[in-house]
């Protein structure tokens, strides 16, 4: 795309710069309005400066992606109410053989769960569990928090529903769920293993000891303590965390919310429920939540429309709950949806200036994915941009350009270029604390924990995050797209 007129390029760059500044530094002193308002401000400036028309701005908002995000948050809320993440927490503690064993469990469970339930959701729910498990065994919290954050990002790379940038890539590339999964799965598994090995090597001495007796695990003392602390926090301080990238509130755990799907407010239930025992009612609702979620994943693999499949699953859970859905819908992070809407408009306007295309034209000859050098250059560009401009804007800015360049090589190269973009932009989030919303969630959840709080600083993270990101990215790249169907 040719460069637009100079005033349009300048005004578009200013509007995008405002968006970028507030996305990376949401509490900047002279304009502390946050990421969500910053995205809206960027969108408004694009229209006010006549970089993009109002009609084009509306057209740039990707409704299928917003619908999938919304439905995924609703389904995730019901799964938390059904105790899904509490069971994951128990799996971490069950017959633990020491600190190193627990470290491996945190890495594996978090990575696999993040691929299915998004990295942000897993970090919201599992952070306090991990803190409690480490404290019970007199183990340092830092290695486990790093394992949680980095494994969540690596694991989320494997599926289109693992993180927001993968959603964008899946919709724009038209790659099916199963092709996306198989294309990145080998890299994800290798990356998870390498990341786990690096954590063990770096913190081997600190992880000595920490074995848990079978009686203690059977009694479930760890999980009871965590739930008690979280319920106390909910009663003492009912307020929003204010993180636009957090898909659901951390207080939505099973048994901790009187408005949850599993609560027994019998007066609001259907008469059919009145004729059932309390145990059967709860068992039916929980079983239904698990069954329809499995059905949703199967539908994804069969190639059905992901957005409407997720929305259908969400509304099925709402209908079977037999209650006013407002309490459940209130837990959706609407600020995240607004952020995405503003970002779509802002990035679309910036693209219309022609500046991203002009910059890419300079880099394209050195970024061919059919050569090792080209793949290396492209990966470095994606990695740097993902940490400077965040991963979702990077995907929106570079996706079409990278795919167009790959189309001159072969159709298979186009698919591999999208998968490469998904892998590198996701793993790049592990480089620093600011590289991923999941990192910030772990940091804030750990700092605000009612029990065993821990302050994970920027430097604590980057000391491990930098080498891990470089090694995991490099090892995963040759494995991208090796399995085709």
Swiss-Prot record:
GO terms for cellular component: membrane; plasma membrane. The keyword Zinc does not apply. Signal peptide: none annotated. One of its GO terms (biological process) is transmembrane transport. It is a multi-pass membrane protein. Coiled coil: none annotated. The chain crosses the membrane at residues 14-34, 37-57, 59-79, 106-126, 180-200, 283-303, 336-356, 377-397, 418-438, 461-481. It comes from the Eukaryota. CDD domains: YbiR_permease. Residues 233-242 have a biased composition (Basic and acidic residues). Pfam families: CitMHS. It is found in: Cell membrane. Residues 233-261 are annotated as: Disordered. Keywords: Cell membrane, Membrane, Transmembrane, Transmembrane helix, Transport. InterPro entries: Cit_transptr-like_dom. Silicon efflux transporter involved in silicon transport in shoots. In the nodes, involved with LSI2 and NIP2-2/LSI6 in silicon intervascular transfer, which is required for the preferential distribution of silicon, such as hyperaccumulation of silicon in the husk. Silicon is beneficial to plant growth and helps plants to overcome abiotic and biotic stresses by preventing lodging (falling over) and increasing resistance to pests and diseases, as well as other stresses. Belongs to the arsenite-antimonite (ArsB) efflux (TC 2.A.45) family. This is Silicon efflux transporter LSI3. The gene is LSI3.
């Amino acid at each position: 795309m040719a460069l637009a007129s100079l005033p349009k390029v300048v005004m578009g760059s200013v509007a995008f710069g405002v968006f970028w500044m507030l996305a990376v530094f949401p509490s900047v002193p002279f304009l502390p309005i946050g990421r969500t308002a910053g995205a809206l401000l960027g969108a408004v400036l694009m229209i006010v400066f006549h970089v993009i028309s109002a009609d084009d701005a509306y057209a740039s908002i990707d409704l299928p992606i917003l619908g999938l995000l919304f439905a995924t948050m609703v389904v995730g809320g019901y799964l938390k109410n059904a105790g899904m993440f509490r069971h994951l927490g128990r799996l971490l503690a069950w017959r633990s053989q020491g600190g190193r064993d627990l470290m491996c469990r945190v890495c594996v469970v978090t990575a696999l769960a993040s691929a299915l339930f998004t990295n942000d959701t897993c970090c919201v729910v599992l952070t306090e569990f991990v803190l409690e498990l480490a404290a019970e065994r007199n183990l340092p919290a830092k290695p486990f928090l790093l394992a949680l954050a980095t494994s969540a990002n690596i694991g989320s790379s494997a599926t289109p529903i693992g993180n927001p940038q993968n959603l964008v890539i899946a919709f724009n590339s038209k790659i099916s769920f199963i092709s996306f999964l198989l294309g990145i799965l080998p890299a994800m598994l290798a990356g998870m293993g390498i990341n786990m090995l690096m954590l063990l090597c770096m913190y081997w001495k600190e992880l000595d000891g920490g074995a848990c007796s079978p009686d203690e695990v059977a009694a479930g003392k760890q999980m009871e303590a965590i739930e008690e602390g979280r319920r106390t926090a909910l009663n003492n301080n009912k307020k929003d965390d204010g993180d636009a990238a957090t898909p659901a509130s951390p207080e939505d755990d099973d048994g901790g919310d009187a408005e949850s799907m599993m609560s027994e407010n019998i007066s609001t239930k259907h008469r059919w429920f009145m004729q059932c025992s309390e145990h059967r009612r709860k068992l039916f609702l929980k079983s239904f939540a698990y069954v329809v979620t499995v059905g949703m994943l199967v539908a994804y693999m069969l190639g059905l429309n992901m957005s409407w499949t997720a929305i259908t699953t969400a509304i099925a859970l709402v209908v079977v709950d037999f209650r006013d859905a407002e309490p459940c819908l209130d837990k959706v992070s609407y600020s995240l949806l607004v952020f995405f809407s503003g970002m779509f408009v802002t990035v679309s306007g910036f693209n219309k200036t022609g500046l991203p295309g002009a910059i890419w034209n300079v880099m394209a000859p050195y970024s061919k994915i059919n050569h090792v050098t080209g793949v290396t250059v492209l990966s470095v560009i994606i990695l740097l941009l993902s940490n400077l401009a965040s991963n979702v804007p990077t995907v929106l800015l570079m996706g079409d350009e990278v795919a167009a360049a790959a189309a001159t090589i072969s159709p298979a190269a186009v698919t591999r270029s999208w998968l490469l973009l998904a892998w590198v932009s996701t793993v790049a989030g592990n480089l620093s604390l600011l590289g991923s919303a999941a990192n910030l969630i772990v940091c804030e959840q750990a700092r605000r924990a009612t029990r065993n709080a821990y302050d994970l600083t920027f430097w604590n993270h980057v000391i491990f995050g930098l080498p891990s990101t470089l090694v995991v990215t490099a090892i995963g790249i040759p494995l991208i797209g090796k399995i085709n169907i």
